[in-house]
């Protein structure tokens, strides 16, 4: 959530900056109208409180003199009733302002390129050279069928479209990938591993910005009567980041760096007809998430570090990729700056997103009231939060199957994964 004070004091400037966000126009007139109502009611509340306090003192003095105070008491009671009414009106206006503020995306950083969609993203660099095959390249679906390791028909039978059953050595590689990523991030990159709930409450989803705007993209769990309403997590970013909600952190304890391997659940609303074949776009997929909680002045530096750590996974797996700086029209709702990592997919002859690494600035921290304080300082300030995929396990599996395929349909196991697969070098029939 954007700082309300910043909105009040720089409304026109903020509205102009947010015009570059795809599909969003800040309703300046509505916000201004609500803000005027807030000011009027705030002044009225303060005036009534002052008058009531003054009359209360008058009552005390009159009573001490033995005077009749019944009229004064009636006036104070009337003021009290009027004050309660005005307070209620003020609370309603403040709620409206907050609800409007919750729909406003984050302000893009100055260095983010202007653009309408992903065609305007800026490529930063490419790493690795796509392999030239001397045979007809198969996609991961065909390879999975040859090896008996990807069963989409079973996924449809058990659940429906955009589900799959992974079996045998391919399932083992899927597990190995997650273990490899976690070991890399905990042993070399300084992250603490977390095991978190896959079901979260709505307060948690508000904290990281999924609600109220993106409710249709979530799988909601209908509770029994009088029970808490839950949603399945769309990413481990949600529970892991919310661990610092309502906390005041000693700045000496920052940065906090946490990683988690979880399944992720997304309805893929708005994705009808896109990537209907294979593992690229599923309702359920695994991901290793990276989260950092940092001091405000260090968040841009932390974004570079976090992105480099996600890149390291691709480099160790020797998978060609490119790094892309997202434009204003393609960034996520809560991000101020985002890098996407896109891995080479031979059968599609293109790069596909495998990681998105974002600096959320104080956007989530304000929603969560996550603060930090320097030693000896009474004042607190909002932390900055960052997150990124390190990596999406299913898409990494797709990239390995296609980039490491052999002419007979077998798959060469990347060297860094072999210790996790009991030394297996080739996955064959």
Swiss-Prot record:
Keyword Lipoprotein in record: no
Catalyzed reactions: tRNA(Ser) + L-serine + ATP = L-seryl-tRNA(Ser) + AMP + diphosphate + H(+); tRNA(Sec) + L-serine + ATP = L-seryl-tRNA(Sec) + AMP + diphosphate + H(+)
UniProt GO molecular function: ATP binding; serine-tRNA ligase activity
Statement: the UniProt record of this protein carries the keyword Nucleotide-binding: yes
Enzyme Commission number, as recorded: 6.1.1.11
GO cellular component, one term: cytoplasm
Keywords: Aminoacyl-tRNA synthetase, ATP-binding, Cytoplasm, Ligase, Nucleotide-binding, Protein biosynthesis
Domain notes: Consists of two distinct domains, a catalytic core and a N-terminal extension that is involved in tRNA binding.
Similarity field: Belongs to the class-II aminoacyl-tRNA synthetase family. Type-1 seryl-tRNA synthetase subfamily.
Biological function: Catalyzes the attachment of serine to tRNA(Ser). Is also able to aminoacylate tRNA(Sec) with serine, to form the misacylated tRNA L-seryl-tRNA(Sec), which will be further converted into selenocysteinyl-tRNA(Sec).
Subunit structure: Homodimer. The tRNA molecule binds across the dimer.
Protein name per the record: Serine--tRNA ligase
Organism: Histophilus somni (strain 2336) (Haemophilus somnus)
Encoding gene, per UniProt annotation: serS
């Amino acid at each position: 959530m954007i700082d309300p004070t910043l909105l009040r004091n720089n409304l026109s400037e903020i509205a102009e900056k947010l015009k570059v966000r795809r599909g969003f126009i800040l309703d300046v007139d509505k916000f201004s109208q609500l803000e005027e109502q807030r000011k009027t009611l705030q002044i009225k509340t303060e005036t009534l409180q002052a008058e009531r306090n003054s009359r209360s003192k008058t009552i005390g003095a009159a009573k001490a003199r033995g005077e009749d105070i019944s009229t004064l008491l009636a006036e104070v009671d009337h003021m009290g009733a009027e004050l309660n009414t005005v307070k209620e009106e003020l609370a309603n206006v403040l709620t409206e302002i907050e609800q409007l503020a919750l729909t406003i995306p984050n302000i893009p950083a100055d260095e983010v390129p202007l653009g309408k969609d992903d065609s305007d993203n800026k490529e930063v660099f490419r790493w690795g050279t796509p392999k030239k095959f001397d045979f007809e390249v198969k996609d991961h679906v065909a390879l999975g069928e040859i090896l008996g390791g990807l069963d989409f028909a079973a996924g449809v039978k058990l659940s429906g479209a955009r589900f799959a059953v992974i079996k045998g050595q391919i399932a083992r590689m899927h597990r190995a990938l997650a273990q490899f990523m976690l070991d890399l991030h905990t042993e070399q990159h300084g992250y603490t591993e977390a095991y978190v709930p896959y079901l979260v409450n709505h307060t948690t989803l508000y904290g990281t910005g999924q609600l109220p705007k993106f409710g249709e993209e979530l799988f909601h769990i209908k509770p029994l009567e009088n029970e808490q309403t839950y949603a399945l997590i769309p990413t481990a970013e949600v529970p892991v980041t919310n661990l610092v909600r309502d906390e005041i952190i000693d700045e000496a304890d920052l940065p906090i760096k946490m990683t988690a391997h979880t399944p992720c659940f997304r309805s893929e609303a708005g994705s009808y007809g896109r990537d209907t074949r294979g593992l690229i776009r599923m309702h359920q997929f695994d991901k290793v998430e990276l989260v950092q909680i940092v001091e405000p002045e260090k968040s841009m530096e932390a974004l570079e570090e976090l992105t480099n750590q996600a890149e390291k996974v691709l480099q160790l797996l020797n998978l060609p990729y490119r790094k892309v700086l997202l434009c204003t029209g393609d960034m996520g709702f809560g991000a101020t700056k985002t890098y996407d990592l896109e891995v080479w997919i031979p059968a599609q002859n293109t790069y596909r997103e495998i990681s998105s690494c974002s600096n959320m600035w104080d956007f989530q921290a304000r929603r969560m009231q996550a603060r930090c304080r320097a030693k000896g300082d009474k004042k607190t300030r909002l932390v900055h939060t960052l997150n990124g995929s390190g990596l999406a396990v299913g898409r990494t599996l797709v990239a390995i199957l296609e980039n490491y395929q052999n002419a007979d349909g077998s798959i060469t196991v990347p060297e860094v994964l072999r210790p996790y697969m009991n030394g297996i070098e080739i996955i064959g029939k």
